[in-house]
């Protein structure tokens, strides 16, 4: 199989660390509401790649995370701080964040089945990895690769990463702070 390599901007042969196994990680859903077409596209593309590799004789191991806690986002594009999506939905519906997460996780799997998208082999939940995330964040802050902003959120320090922008094509000197 050949895929477009964003780093080299060329179409390359897919190579794996083990000749007969392709390990694939793809972002999974944030389970605070129904998935939309844009979300499902990600899962469909992952499924198509996995099916193609299996058709070519490779074993695939697919992992998709379930974000069931702590999803902060600025969906406005205006640089405003948005509420945690799980907590906002909890306040709106009167259900606990866990009840919401488990309900929409179930709906997500039903949607995959309806679309004939093969399920991933593993679905680790963010809520199961909080301690390791906190440890990693602490390490990033201590090493100068992340910092705490004025809003008490933790941000990655792009300046600390010499090859920042190699994948996206962005250059730090051309980016405007606070803009997407």
For each of these PLM feature ranges, what is it?
Residues 1-180:
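NTP-dependent nucleotidyl-transfer catalytic core
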């Amino acid at each position: 199989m050949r895929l477009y390599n964003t780093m080299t901007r060329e179409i390359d042969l897919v190579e794996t660390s083990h000749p007969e196994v392709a390990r694939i990680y793809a972002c999974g859903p944030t389970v605070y509401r129904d998935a939309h077409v844009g979300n499902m596209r990600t899962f469909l593309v992952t499924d198509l790649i996995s099916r193609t590799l299996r058709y070519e004789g490779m074993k695939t191991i697919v992992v998709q995370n379930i974000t069931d806690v702590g999803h902060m986002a600025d969906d406005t594009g205006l640089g405003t701080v948005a509420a945690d999506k799980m907590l906002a939905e909890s306040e709106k519906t009167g259900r606990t964040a866990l009840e919401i997460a488990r309900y929409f996780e179930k709906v997500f799997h039903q949607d995959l089945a309806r679309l004939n998208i093969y399920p991933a082999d593993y679905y680790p939940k963010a809520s199961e990895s909080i301690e390791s995330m906190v440890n990693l964040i602490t390490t990033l802050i201590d090493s100068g690769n992340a910092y705490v902003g004025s809003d008490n959120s933790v941000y990655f320090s792009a300046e600390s990463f010499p090859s920042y922008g190699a994948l996206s094509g962005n250059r730090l000197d051309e980016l405007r702070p606070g803009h997407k």
